[in-house]
Amino acid sequence: MASNLLSRLLPSASDDLLEQEASNNQNRRTSSSTDERPDMDIDEENFGARFEAQDLNDLLAEASSSHMTTESRAASPEARRNAPPGINTAARAPAWRQPAPARAVPLDDDDDVPQSLLLEGGLDPPPNPHPRPDGLPPPVPGPSTRHTRAQWETTRQQQRLHGDDRGGAPVRDWGAIGRGGQFTADPKEKASWLWVNQTDLDTYMREVYEYYVGSGIYSMILRRTLSLLQSAFVVGFMTFLGWCIDYSKLSGSNKLSQVLVPKCTKEIHGFWIFALWVFTIYWLYSFYGLLTDIPRLRAMHDFYHYLLDVPDRDIQTIQWQQIVSRIMALRDLNLTTASNLSPETRKLLDSKSRQRLDAVDIASRLMRRDNYLIALFNKEILDVTVPIPFLGNRFIFSETTGWHVNLAVMEFVFSGPNGQFNQDFLKERNRRELVRRLRGRFFWTGIISIICAPFAVVFVLASYLFKYFTEYHKDPGQLSNRDFTTFAQWKFREFNELPHLFNRRRNMAYPYANLYLAQFPKDKTEQISSFVAFIAGAFASVLVAFTLLDSELFLTFEISPGKTAIFWIGVLTTIYRVARGSSPQEDQVTDPSYYLDHVIYHTRYKPDSWQDRLHTDEVRAEFAKLYQPKILIFAEEILSMVVTPFLLMFRLPQCSERIVDFFREFSIVVDGLGVTCSYSMFPFKKGTQNVNNAPANRSGAHKDDGDLREDYFMAKDNKMLASYYGFLDTYATTGKGNSARLPGRAGFHPPPQFPNAFGAMSQTAQPVDVGARGTSRGPAGRQPLQRRTPRSGPAGRDEPIASVLLDPHHQPSSASILRGSPRTGPSGRYRTPLQPVADTPGTRIEEESTIGDSWRTSRLAQDDDEEEEAPGANRGGVLQLLQQFSKAQAEGRGAGVGV
């Protein structure tokens, strides 16, 4: 009845445009008043009504003069059923019934209400001319909070109200809503609801990335299940081999039943029984965690399948950059990341700032912890050296050591709510207390390492033996295979570089690292190896020849007591293969600098001490410490299980003060992102000229106090710039569907040039940029040693391209030019590599860098470069003719070359 009275008093929908504008202004003022007063509620029936100020004032005056103290329609059961979720309609009066501040009229205490205005619960309300359509979800009862009100405001802005469906199309049936507001019918609606209400973006983005790396729900469940079964098999098989076999009876027995120990479980030592109980509890806990993670994985599967449109069958082939672009397209559907929320609605959210979620922000969230570890290694704050007799100090940082450091340091730093950064580290007054607590954590982590070391050593040894024994027995040459150590990989990693991208870059460096170490000739060793291979091959060839003549007789012929010919054939063949592998190859060209240049290009690691010394044996020795045989890496892993307690209890506590100071001085608070490492914020708008002129990149000049301070905050080995250019190379795209270098989509390019008499990489023969990295990154693993030949050498452009994966504040500015970039391509033998090229007056000299090609994503940019080269192109000569011929082929012209 109250709504009918207002409908007669207020203007109708057929008023003129001026009255509609005034009504809209009044509605905005009413909405703002509702937001500013959290104790008010909303009468849903009057959502679509329009009010004039004088009408409301007259109505309030009439109500006060008649001594009316009616209750809101929200108090009725029908209104409570029609209220939106999260809105408490029983405790407060509607917003339109609140007295105006300028004309507040005190209400009388008389409770007499006219009979016509009474709304009894048992009486039927008057029929609504516009009945509520069927199929709408029933309200979910719950307390009214700021978060639920913000959700309702967002939903009201993005979806039409119930009253707007009059005479329209039938409303879609949302399906039943289960207890707690969870959708039970439509998985797409459930995935949308979960994304809209997601507030912990760090955890959610981590789950999204783990799902992508894990290749989908079924692959992740299968991998974890097989891992549990493998660990159970290893422990059970070790128990059987250790306690259920009588090894003293092996020599005189020919059946397994004769050597088995009956009721062997009673013979197991108490210490091993304790270990079995601990392992059983851990295994059951892991299995329970797998079962409880299935609903979460199912929800992530729906998110990929319905919102990102990426089914599990495509998740192994789609690029991460496409996943990022599709997540960015969903930002306006989330409360915390939406850009279309009003300031009044934003005030009701827990986070007053809009959460940032572009490519840089997603990488910063995923790498929030790893960025700090990369910076700790870059600044050389963690002292993980162990003095070894006759060998000096050696770096010992294996996966076991990294796990304990993460437990002692990173779990302490990120001990805030929901695993966030602990704000105590940002305050200098907490320094002494934090140092004391960090030393205590190092000590107790060392105690835990001592307790777990015996079990870990036995388990890892058995697992490694069961996994690799067959491979090493079949091919002994695999014992010499090398890999980068864990310490080296942390030195190579870049800021905001996701693990799967780093693994791809590391894999590209493997073939060149092997060829580099094989470049250093050892003349004496090679001569001896050739002689041994000759002798072993001679004996083996004679034995094989006699075997072919009379195999039945000669195979049982004993050359030495108890050793037949077949035994000696196997021994001599093994000796020959090992000696032959150490002999030099006839077609090998010795040029260590060439191969190490390619290793540096992919690893992006080049200390200052290596400058102009890539051919020396000292550099080879330093590189060999980073690239060691796998068998030595495994031995170091076993040794670290014994050495790690020493590091945790004696070495690392001495670094506690520097660690605490590091987290305070290299942490910044970013609005919409939280606390993050300062190195993860790239200089998109500041440019790189000032960074290149920083003290860390200057030499030979006297450094004052200001320069020393800048040097302290500067990353070593140009790590910051390398990370910046690497990130742009990974995520740079124009949004046209093609990335910087998508394989199979580029135009025709001529074949690579042949090496000339000056060497394969001389100044006239352009370098072959192997495994050049584009946005698509190509297939994982080791890349072929070829790419298209540039027309005039790759050249960096002055203006960077814009990327659809970056927000406007992250777009590279014109100041962020590529000259001076540390990411230059492998240079020639007679050319100084990796040197920035300065501009000369009247001439633009571009550095020889493969990053330049990755920034050229349009054919127009390449044509502009060709036009710039045209005026000074006529230099004559055979090389010029070949260049013109290659250019004609690249442009697709079938005509001849003009001479």
Curated annotation (Swiss-Prot):
Domain text: Forms a homotrimer with a solvated central pore, which is connected laterally to the cytosol through the cavity within each protomer. Acts as a lipid scramblase that uses its central pore to function: the central pore opens laterally to accommodate lipid headgroups, thereby enabling lipid flipping and redistribution of lipids added to the outer leaflet of ATG9-containing vesicles, thereby enabling growth into autophagosomes.
Residues in compartment: Cytoplasmic: 1-224, 292-441, 463-527, 574-629, 651-899
Protein name, entry field: Autophagy-related protein 9
Phylogenetic placement of the source organism: Eukaryota, Fungi, Dikarya, Ascomycota, Pezizomycotina
Residue stretches spanning the membrane: 225-245, 271-291, 528-548, 553-573
Secretion signal, residue range per the UniProt entry: none
UniProt-listed GO biological process terms: lipid transport; mitophagy; piecemeal microautophagy of the nucleus; protein localization to phagophore assembly site; reticulophagy
Compartment(s) where it occurs, according to its Swiss-Prot or TrEMBL record: Preautophagosomal structure membrane; Cytoplasmic vesicle membrane; Golgi apparatus membrane; Endoplasmic reticulum membrane
Subunit record text: Homotrimer; forms a homotrimer with a central pore that forms a path between the two membrane leaflets.
Biased composition (Low complexity): 23-33, 90-104
Name of the gene: ATG9
Bias kind Pro residues: ranges: 124-142
Keyword terms: Autophagy, Cytoplasmic vesicle, Endoplasmic reticulum, Golgi apparatus, Lipid transport, Membrane, Phosphoprotein, Transmembrane, Transmembrane helix, Transport
InterPro entries: Autophagy-rel_prot_9
Residue intervals annotated with topology Lumenal: 246-270, 549-552
Gene Ontology terms: cellular component: autophagosome; cytoplasmic vesicle membrane; endoplasmic reticulum membrane; Golgi membrane; phagophore assembly site; phagophore assembly site membrane
Biased composition (Polar residues): 63-73, 151-160, 851-860
PTM (free text): Phosphorylated by ATG1. ATG1 phosphorylation is required for preautophagosome elongation.
Coiled-coil region list: none
Domain of life: Eukaryota
Organism: Phaeosphaeria nodorum (strain SN15 / ATCC MYA-4574 / FGSC 10173) (Glume blotch fungus)
Family of this protein: Belongs to the ATG9 family.
Main location: membrane
